[in-house]
Amino acid sequence: MFDKIPISHKPEETKIALLAGGSSGERPISLKSAEGAKEALEQAGYQVTQLDPAEAADLKALIDGGFDVAFLALHGKGGEDGAIQGFLQTIGLPYTCSGIWGSAVAIDKTKAKVFYREEGIPTPAGMTIARGDAYDVADVVAKLGDKVAVKAATEGSSIGVYIVEGADEIGRALKDGLDIDTKVLVEQFVKGTELTCVVMGSGDSAQALPVIEIIPQNASYDFESKYAPGGSEHVCPARIDDASTAAVQKHAVAAHNALGCEGVTRTDFLLEENGDMWALETNTVPGMTATSLLPDAARAVGVSFPELATMMVQMALDADR
């Protein structure tokens, strides 16, 4: 049972700065998210101005524009790492999604993994390799097996993610990953059903939405599967048993709170055939494109996209930052 967020503001009297673009590798996805968010916000009755933090003139407009809330459609570095959150807090402008701390921790897969483990949230075995570190591929294979996932630590949208097998492929993936980011997370490969769970709220009020099962057309849920039309099928609620559903939702809320997140997050999981479940990462600014999972989860509990956007604005106004 999902309890809708009570709305105490009037959308028609609320000026929204929709922040999108930025300078990260996820800029194209951010702009696509902004298209969906802008349509939803305008349908809800808001006055919406889209601004790009990568443009100095837009930053000045953000300061001087008399906005009531910044609605974040920024993905990746500069948008999900605490940077824009710190700027917005400095100028006293409420904003959607997580604060400085939650954003900074969640974007770093290596740090998030530490918090998962401390909270008893199952997550695949892994190791961190930083740019400039001496490493031995044979050591990686000995610890994690000869099939692994190599992930750029602070990139999203499956940028810098490689599923590789054998020492040669692992070595190439490590080199490529460290060209993209300053460190990589190397994880034991896990084969299973891909699941994701949206959480809304914070602390004791955080609640999980229905679990979504992701069926990618490619071998894994990569960039193309996420954003190309027809790249993946989303089944909501997921075709898993009640116990697995409850466990995913419990771990998603635990991850949301352990990382200090607020507003809306989406945590990705893998479920093996034997019932073992693994948390992979938590996204603090979930996508809002036509193929995104956040609107799908909201629809499953009877919440339209404009209604969802309104709830996100309300949580921004209510946040104690």
PLM feature spans:
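Glycine-rich phosphate-binding loop of ATP-grasp-fold ATP-dependent ligases
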Residues: 30, 124-126, 147-172, 194-196, ...
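ATP-dependent carboxylate activation and anion-phosphoryl transfer catalytic cores
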Residues: 2-14, 118-120, 241-321
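ATP-grasp fold ATP-binding core
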Residues: 116-117, 141-159, 181-191, 195
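Phosphate-binding site of ATP-dependent enzymes
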Residues: 18, 165-250, 273-278
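Hydrophobic beta-strand scaffold residues
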Residues: 48, 94-95, 123, 148, ...
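A short glycine-rich, hydrophobically flanked beta-strand micro-motif that places a catalytic Asp/Glu
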Residues: 49-53, 184, 188, 262-274
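ATP-binding N-terminal substructure of ATP-dependent carboxylate-amine bond-forming enzymes
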Residues: 1-101, 105-107, 111-114, 118, ...
